[in-house]
C-alpha cells in the first residue's frame, strides 16, 4: 500500500450491480477511502423483447452508490470487449477448443481497459468483488492468494494478472465467506442484498448457448463414433461439445457390447469433423499424463526458464493436482503426479504454491505417456 491515508487514497470500484461489488464499495467507503463506482458496459445484451439487463444492473449500481454516498459513472467497453475477448472466444471455438472468456475478460477488460480508465479518474487503486487476496511482502512484491471462501475462490480466473496490475488492485472481499457478504449487504440495507448471483458467460446470460453460438459460427454436423470405429449417430457441430461431457449426446439409451455405462465425449477430430465418444466416466482415453500450454503469465517476476514442483487446477473449483512444470519463456510443459481426467485444450491451467496463485497458461495439447492424445 502507498503511504497515503485512506482519505487521500482514491479507489475506483468496478460495480456490476451485484451484491459482491456493492459490498466491496461499502467496505471501502466505511474504511475511509475516496471511493468512485464505475459500471462497465461490455456487451449489448438487449433481448428479443427489447429488455437490456445492463440497464437494470446500472440502476442497481446507482441505487447502491446513492445509498452509501459515492459518485458513480458508466463506461462503455463494448468495442474493447468485442476485439479482445469475443473475437478470441469465437476463434477458439473455430479451432475446436473450449475457451475461457472469464480469464480473458479479467486480463483484457477489468484489469486493463478498466484499470486504464480508473487511472484517468485519478485512482490509486481499482477494486473488484472477486474472492481473492493480495499481500505485499517486505520487498514490495505483491502475492495473490486464494480467497478465504474455498468454494468461491476466483484466483483461477485472475491467473493472468501481472505484478503491475496486482500492485494497483484491492480485493476487499478476499478474507470473507459469501454468506458473510450477504449479511453485510442485508445489515446495511443495500438495494442488491437479495439479488441472485449472475451465472454463466456474461455475454450469453440466460440465453441458450447452442443457439447463441450458432448465430456467430455456422454449425457443421458430422459423425459421432467410438474409437473402435462404430458409428453411433450424428453430432450437431464439434463446437458444441467439450472433452468429458456427458449430457446432450442423444445416445443415452444405446448400450455397448459389454456395459451399460453412460457415454462421454472422449475426443474430437477437426480434420474429419468427427466426435468420438466412449462409455464410462473413467474411460481410459479421458486420462492424460502431461500437457503443453502457452500464453504463460506469472503474477510476479520469474526466471525465463525453470522447473518447479507445485500444484495446479485445470478447471474452476477443481481440487489441486500435484505437477512439475517446465517453463520456457511464455510456454510451459506440465507433468502430472497422477493421470488427470478430461484435460481440455483452450482452458486455463493455473499454478499454486500453497495458498499463492503463481499464474497460469492456456492449454494447447495433452499427452499420455509422451504421446499426443489422439482426437482431443
From Swiss-Prot:
The record marks 130, 347 as: Interaction with tRNA. It is found in: Cytoplasm. Keywords: ATP-binding, Cytoplasm, Disulfide bond, Nucleotide-binding, RNA-binding, Transferase, tRNA processing, tRNA-binding. Residues 152-154, 315-316 are annotated as: Interaction with tRNA. It catalyses: S-sulfanyl-L-cysteinyl-[protein] + uridine(34) in tRNA + AH2 + ATP = 2-thiouridine(34) in tRNA + L-cysteinyl-[protein] + A + AMP + diphosphate + H(+). GO terms for cellular component: cytoplasm. It comes from the Bacteria. The keyword Nucleotide-binding applies. Pfam families: tRNA_Me_trans, tRNA_Me_trans_C, tRNA_Me_trans_M. ATP binds at residues 14-21, 40, 129. The active site is at 105 (nucleophile), 202 (cysteine persulfide intermediate). Residues 100-102 are annotated as: Interaction with target base in tRNA. GO terms for molecular function: ATP binding; tRNA binding; tRNA-uridine 2-sulfurtransferase activity. Its EC number is 2.8.1.13. Disulfide bonds join 105-202. The keyword RNA-binding applies. Belongs to the MnmA/TRMU family. Catalyzes the 2-thiolation of uridine at the wobble position (U34) of tRNA, leading to the formation of s(2)U34. This is tRNA-specific 2-thiouridylase MnmA. It comes from Lactococcus lactis subsp. lactis (strain IL1403).
Amino acid at each position: 500500500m502507498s503511504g497515503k491515508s485512506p482519505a487521500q487514497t482514491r479507489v475506483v470500484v468496478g460495480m456490476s450491480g451485484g451484491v459482491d461489488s456493492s459490498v466491496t464499495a461499502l467496505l471501502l467507503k466505511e474504511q475511509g477511502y475516496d471511493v468512485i463506482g464505475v459500471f462497465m458496459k461490455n456487451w449489448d445484451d438487449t433481448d428479443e423483447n427489447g429488455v437490456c439487463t445492463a440497464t437494470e444492473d446500472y440502476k442497481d449500481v446507482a441505487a447502491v452508490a446513492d445509498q452509501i454516498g459515492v459518485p458513480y459513472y458508466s463506461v462503455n467497453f463494448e468495442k474493447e470487449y468485442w476485439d479482445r475477448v469475443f473475437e478470441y472466444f469465437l476463434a477458439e471455438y473455430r479451432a475446436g477448443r473450449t475457451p475461457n472468456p472469464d480469464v480473458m475478460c479479467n486480463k483484457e477488460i477489468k484489469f486493463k481497459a478498466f484499470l486504464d480508465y480508473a487511472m484517468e479518474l485519478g485512482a490509486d487503486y481499482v477494486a473488484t468483488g472477486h474472492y481473492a487476496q493480495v499481500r505485499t511482502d517486505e520487498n514490495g512484491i505483491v502475492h495473490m492468494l486464494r480467497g478465504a471462501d474455498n468454494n468461491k475462490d476466483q484466483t483461477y480466473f485472475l491467473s493472468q494478472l501481472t505484478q503491475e496490475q496486482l500492485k494497483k488492485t484491492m480485493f476487499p472481499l478476499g478474507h470473507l465467506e459469501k454468506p458473510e457478504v450477504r449479511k453485510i449487504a442485508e445489515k446495511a440495507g443495500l438495494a442488491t442484498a437479495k439479488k441472485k448471483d449472475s451465472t454463466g458467460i456474461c455475454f450469453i446470460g440466460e440465453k441458450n448457448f447452442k443457439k447463441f453460438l450458432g448465430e456467430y459460427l455456422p454449425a457443421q454436423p458430422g459423425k459421432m463414433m467410438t474409437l473402435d470405429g462404430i458409428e453411433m449417430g450424428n453430432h450437431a457441430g464439434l463446437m458444441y461439445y467439450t472433452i468429458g461431457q456427458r449430457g446432450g449426446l442423444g445416445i443415452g439409451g444405446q448400450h455397448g457390447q459389454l456395459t451399460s455405462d453412460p457415454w462421454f465425449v472422449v475426443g474430437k477430430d477437426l480434420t474429419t469433423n468427427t466426435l468420438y465418444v466412449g462409455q464410462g466416466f473413467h474411460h481410459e482415453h479421458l486420462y492424460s499424463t502431461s500437457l503443453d500450454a502457452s500464453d504463460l503469465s506469472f503474477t510476479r517476476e520469474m526466471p525465463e526458464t525453470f522447473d518447479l514442483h507445485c500444484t495446479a487446477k485445470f478447471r474452476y473449483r477443481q481440487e489441486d493436482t500435484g505437477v512439475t512444470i517446465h517453463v520456457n519463456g511464455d510456454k510451459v510443459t506440465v507433468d502430472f503426479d497422477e493421470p488427470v481426467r478430461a484435460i481440455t485444450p483452450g482452458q486455463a491451467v493455473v499454478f499454486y504454491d500453497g495458498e499463492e496463485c503463481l499464474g497460469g497458461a492456456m492449454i494447447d495439447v495433452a499427452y499420455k505417456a509422451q504421446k499426443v492424445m489422439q482426437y482431443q
